[in-house]
UniProtKB/Swiss-Prot annotation:
This is Large ribosomal subunit protein bL36. One of its GO terms (cellular component) is ribonucleoprotein complex. It comes from the Bacteria. The keyword Glycoprotein does not apply. Pfam families: Ribosomal_L36. Keywords: Ribonucleoprotein, Ribosomal protein. InterPro entries: Ribosomal_bL36 (IPR000473), Ribosomal_bL36_sp (IPR035977). It comes from Burkholderia multivorans (strain ATCC 17616 / 249).
Length: 38
């Protein structure tokens, strides 16, 4: 999980979602693409 100031999609499988007011990126193809804004 990377904590980034601005989250971006790295590949086409990345999805940007918002959980409890926190913007996150989840990826089904590569778990290393997981990010959260903070």
């Amino acid at each position: 999980m990377k904590v980034m100031a601005s989250v971006k999609r790295i590949c086409r499988n990345c999805k940007i979602i918002k959980r409890k007011g926190v913007v996150r990126v989840i990826c089904s193809s590569d778990p290393r693409h997981k990010q959260r804004q903070g």
